[in-house]
Amino acid sequence: MFRRAFLAFSAPVLLLAVLFCCPAISLAQGSSAAATQAPATQAQIAALERQVQAAQMAGDNAWMLVSAALVLLMTGPGLALFYGGLVRRKNILGTMMQSFAMMGLITLVWAVIGYSLAFGRGNGFIGGFEHIFLRGVSLAPNPAYAATIPEQTFMIYQLMFAIITPALITGALAERVKFGALAVFLALWSLVVYCPMAHMIWGVGGLLNINGGLWPCLDFAGGTVVHVTSGASALVAAIYLGKRDGYPDNAMPPHSMVLSFIGACLLWVGWFGFNAGSALSAGPLATSAFINTQFAAAAAAFSWTLVEWLQNGKPTALGAISGAVAGLATITQASGYVQPMSAVVIGLIAGVVCCLMVLKVKKFFGYDDSLDAFGVHGMGGTMGALLTGLLASGAINAVFGADAAGHPRPVGAVDGNPGQVLNQAIAMGIGWVLAIAGTLLLLLLIDKTIGLRVSPAHENEGLDLSQHGEEGYEFSS
């Protein structure tokens, strides 16, 4: 009896104990499992983050290497063909060699000391010697310039800018300069003019750097660094060297518009690497610069052609391709800062103003800028500097950060920052002064030592034979 009563009483108690204990056991086991799984989950998340970062770096690096190749394409064969077709037949090889020589010579200068002077840590004017012979330039990123690509990729990309900038100057000296003298002049020019300007605007601690400079300058892809300096130097060099024999009394038309046409198309394509590549990553900013590049080139080709058509009664291929290059030069500085329709406006203005510089102003003053390096690049870069300060938008590139409410701070005058136009003008003025002073000093030095200009006999013979001993075209009798 007692046994039955005990079992009747204990059975429900045991059942309740099991019911209450099982969840506790389960929770204890779950807590133990969770404690075991937590580090594993965190490790998986960290591994995924590393994979995402590696994928981003691989994508950015691939885009930047392609962009570097596109910019090199601008010099050779792009600029070489563009300039080569514009000269007389007896000077085509000499002219193309001037561009090609920069691809080799400036590469060596850049590797030895140029990169260090432009992007090494120095003062507000020029970099130091920390990267001489590329010392310390590794496959690891340099966050001061580009956080998702190796510094060697950044270095080689910037090299392509250093190559094409002095090559642009050769257009003002076409058909009358000694090859050796030109090579020495441009190698020194890259150190005296280009590297300081690149450091002031793009280098850490630069006087005009957008991050902490005394006069922050918006120069996305080199409007001032490349086009103002090369254009101003081209004007000084053209005036110093003097006119070609027979200019302007004798007609000196391009010997092959076909070559120039092909060269201009290659320049246009390469410019996507020039501008969109300056985003230094394969992100939305590269897309913005890419679109602005296309829009400005198209608008400038249209407006130059229209002005020429209205004045002369016929549109020319030379006018169309010159307009496109003018638009590309002018949008360079603004490409990563403005809205697409602002790029159209910049292109339309560039085509008209640069056309008038070439057709009217050059004729009025009488200087012999043989291939219009100043009229297209110098004037285009100067306009681009000011128009960038006017039209830059924080909605495209919040380069000055955001306010407390999270809205982009004003960037250009249309954004509510009119002072940026003054900063742009100061930077552009410094570029002009540096280019004029440095170019004149080097020209005087070289002219007094090895001489700059070929003899009248060699000029009449042509640079192909007199400077290189070969001809661009062989015609069988």
What function would you assign to each model-found segment?
Residues 27-477:
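Glycine- and aromatic-enriched membrane alpha-helices
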Residues 1-30:
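N-terminal secretory/membrane targeting signals
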